């Protein structure tokens, strides 16, 4: 049986770790960035409607081995919300612009859900900028309509009415163990969803759940096969957005990939199983071996 996270607060996780939280100008987009640690660059990307605190339980541990950069993607968190569709190429360009602004020539990339989609696209189209790649529950590789509908409807319901009930339901969707969803995490997400202009911003993100828009960026072997970076697929046994059959698809498409399954977790293994998440990253990115 799972227990509540062993932390006082989101920021309590970073209480004894030197870090910097600031906004960076990325091509005119004011972008919220958190940085900690030293060593090889590792950039963390959150999912749809998310924010950098998705990695609150991981940054301190990762900072022991990496110069960690977590950020709010354009149209997310407390970054700017320009009114345009946030398609995968737009999100990838924002990532590359952030790397330029921070003088990061190349980096390891670890992306969760939508963030995984963005990192894979970036690795396929800008291979010189990516060292190694971690795709963390990238979700709905098979473009299942029911998953797209659920993602769109649950997210819009929470943003249109960011009450404790609707937002908690949206956050609980990410977890296998719902009891691990804290009031603080829900209230943080409510604050994001309540930002002026965020309803239009999330609508601009959810265009990716429209099959007609999605088809131009959908996971397909033609572009996935161009990813030359060694890749770790981090999957779970309770991810509501995609099962192990979808991991097998990517294993067949990616030239240099391996799979590690985190058990007893949902769509947010970095929160539900931070120790195993950290070990997998350290094994693959630092030691150059497959996680066990």
Q: Where are the model-predicted features located?
A:
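Short beta-strand/loop motif that positions the catalytic acidic residue
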Residues: 227, 233-235
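Acidic catalytic loop of the alpha/beta-hydrolase fold
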Residues: 238-242
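Catalytic active-site module of serine/aspartate enzymes centered on a nucleophile-bearing elbow/loop
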Residues: 256-292
């Amino acid at each position: 049986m799972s227990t509540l996270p062993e932390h006082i607060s989101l920021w309590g996780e970073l209480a004894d770790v030197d870090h910097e939280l600031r906004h960076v100008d990325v091509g005119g987009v004011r972008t919220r960035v958190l940085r900690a640690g030293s060593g090889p660059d590792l950039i963390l990307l959150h999912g749809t409607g998310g924010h950098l605190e998705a990695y609150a339980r991981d940054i301190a541990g990762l900072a022991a081995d990496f110069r960690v950069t977590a950020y709010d993607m354009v149209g997310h968190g407390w970054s700017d919300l320009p009114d345009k569709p946030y398609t995968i190429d737009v999100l990838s360009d924002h990532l590359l612009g952030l790397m330029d602004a921070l003088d990061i020539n190349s980096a390891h990339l670890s992306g969760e859900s939508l963030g995984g989609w963005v990192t894979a696209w970036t690795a396929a189209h800008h291979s010189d900028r990516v060292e190694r790649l971690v795709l963390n529950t990238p979700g709905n590789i098979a473009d299942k309509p029911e998953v797209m509908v659920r993602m769109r409807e649950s997210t819009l319901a929470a943003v249109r009415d960011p009450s404790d009930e609707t937002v908690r339901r949206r956050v609980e969707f990410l977890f296998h163990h719902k009891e691990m969803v804290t009031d603080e995490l829900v209230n943080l997400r409510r604050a994001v969803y309540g930002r002026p202009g965020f309803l239009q911003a999330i609508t601009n993100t959810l265009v990716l759940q429209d099959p007609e828009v999605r088809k131009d960026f959908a996971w397909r072997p033609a572009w996935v096969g161009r990813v030359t970076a060694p890749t770790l697929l981090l999957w779970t046994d309770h991810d509501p957005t995609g099962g192990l059959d979808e991991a097998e698809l990517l294993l067949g498409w990616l030239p240099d990939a391996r799979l590690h399954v985190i058990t007893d977790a949902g769509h947010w293994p970095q929160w539900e199983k931070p120790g195993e998440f950290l070990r997998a990253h350290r094994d693959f990115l630092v030691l150059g071996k497959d996680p066990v």
